[in-house]
Amino acid sequence: MSLNFLEFEKPIAELEAKIEALRDISRRGGDNALDLDKEIKQLEDKCLDLKKKTFSDLGAWEVAQLARHPERPYVLDYIELMFTEFDELAGDRAFADDKALVGGMARLDGRPVMIIGHQKGRGTKEKVRRNFGMPKPEGYRKAKRLMQMAERFKMPIITFIDTAGAYPGVGAEERGQSEAIATNLKIMSELSVPVICNVVGEGGSGGALAIGVGDYVNMLQYSTYSVISPEGCASILWRDSDKAPQAAEAMGLVAPRLKELELIDTIIDEPLGGAHRNHKATAENIKQRLIEQLNELEGFDEEALLERRYQRLMNYGYC
């Protein structure tokens, strides 16, 4: 069970703490233990009802907080839970290996695929090493190299998007951050193999879009996808980042709204309480959807696949 609770989850946290305390009393009592099963069951039922009520009516700001939860699964977690025979590939063959973006070959249900995804890292040292999941140009050029390799070997491409955005540092801009992102957009629109993109946490601006052009774009239930963070939007519009909750509601960054606008194709359910509550169940939900979509896309020849992707992209912005 997660030890990190968000502000709106505090009533749930208090109930779970009471349940754990009663269980502890029952365990330590030995032969003289009090029979607390009835009380524990009542609290468990109450906690379940509270979770259902809380998560059935989340606002955009609450979803944005869930998308950033520190215990949410990242691409390396999904690789371990969903794929076999993963072989990581490093470097852009020009400048460096960007640890904020992970990629390599693997098998999904026996089928060879290329995986590319943002990795935020856990713990201070790992977060710094991964640059908090914000790739530099060399990261996106690594992604380009792997996508072109996948095309040569006729391997479907699966991406996992979870970034606050592309790294905005001076060095990154000097090395051509915008060019690297733009090049990926062009290449992904022309790839002759199936491409499935999955927003599994934060989908932040061009940093997300640089590995987000595909035949299918899926979003986890409590992920976000937007041109800017709610805090950034609030700072620009109202000069006050404390108005981020209002900005989040106005931006339409949640999966149902994006599905309504046909900017994404599928919303993948998360376990009650969010993906961080059950990594395995979340991975299984994604895996099943990927298998279904790959089975469909592999029925298209190259010309039909590219035409389908072209029509999908041309529909953007149509209301």
Curated annotation (Swiss-Prot):
SUPFAM superfamilies reported in the protein's UniProt record: ClpP/crotonase
GO process terms (BP): fatty acid biosynthetic process; malonyl-CoA biosynthetic process
Tagged with keyword Lipid biosynthesis: yes
CoA carboxyltransferase C-terminal domain segment(s): 35-296
Gene3D superfamilies xref list: 2-enoyl-CoA Hydratase, Chain A, domain 1 (3.90.226.10)
GO cellular component: acetyl-CoA carboxylase complex
Location of the protein in the cell: Cytoplasm
Keywords for the protein's UniProt record, in alphabetical order: ATP-binding, Cytoplasm, Fatty acid biosynthesis, Fatty acid metabolism, Lipid biosynthesis, Lipid metabolism, Nucleotide-binding, Transferase
Known catalytic reactions: N(6)-carboxybiotinyl-L-lysyl-[protein] + acetyl-CoA = N(6)-biotinyl-L-lysyl-[protein] + malonyl-CoA
EC numbers for this chain: 2.1.3.15
A Pfam family the protein falls into: ACCA
Keyword Ribonucleoprotein assigned: no
GO molecular function: acetyl-CoA carboxylase activity; ATP binding; carboxyl- or carbamoyltransferase activity
Top-level class of the enzyme under EC nomenclature: transferase
Pathway(s) where this gene product acts: Lipid metabolism; malonyl-CoA biosynthesis; malonyl-CoA from acetyl-CoA: step 1/1
Family: Belongs to the AccA family.
Function: Component of the acetyl coenzyme A carboxylase (ACC) complex. First, biotin carboxylase catalyzes the carboxylation of biotin on its carrier protein (BCCP) and then the CO(2) group is transferred by the carboxyltransferase to acetyl-CoA to form malonyl-CoA.
Database matches in HAMAP family: AcetylCoA_CT_alpha (MF_00823)
Subunit structure, interactors included: Acetyl-CoA carboxylase is a heterohexamer composed of biotin carboxyl carrier protein (AccB), biotin carboxylase (AccC) and two subunits each of ACCase subunit alpha (AccA) and ACCase subunit beta (AccD).
Protein name per the record: Acetyl-coenzyme A carboxylase carboxyl transferase subunit alpha
Organism, scientific name: Aliivibrio salmonicida (strain LFI1238)
